Amino acid sequence: MILDATTDNLEIILDKAITTNQLSFSVFYNEYTSTTVTPSSNYGTTNSTTAVNLVAAPSSGKQRQLRYCSINNVDTADVGVKIRFNANGSYRNVLYVYLYVNESIQYSEEMGWRVYTANGEEKISSFIKLPSSIRMPEWFGAGALTQITTTNSTA
């Protein structure tokens, strides 16, 4: 992810006010000019529903490339976390994740964005919120389901 304009920022914003502790983050990026590369970092905390820069806009003639980012939910409650690209007030959502207590988000150039459980395991499942009632076809009425069979594949 590269920020190449003086109006480009990578931001974090939460979906609600925190309960006890703001989320903490650590960011590492390279700043490029036409002749140099300077490794840089940013450490901080969120500010509830107010956006905070993970990587601030580069100054004129420079570019910033995100190398690594770690965001940790150190609050006592679950929270929605949005990472967004701010191009001079034009927002593009990069990632939205609901983090449970002690879960984390990590970004690396090699792996992209990943979410980890409180135990450090990669969170790979997703859930679909279903409506409170589902209309089933008429042919699937009472008595239509007569047997449940479990099949194991050896492939």
Where are these regions (language model features)?
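Surface-exposed, low-hydrophobicity beta-strand/loop segments enriched in small/polar/acidic residues
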Residues: 1-155
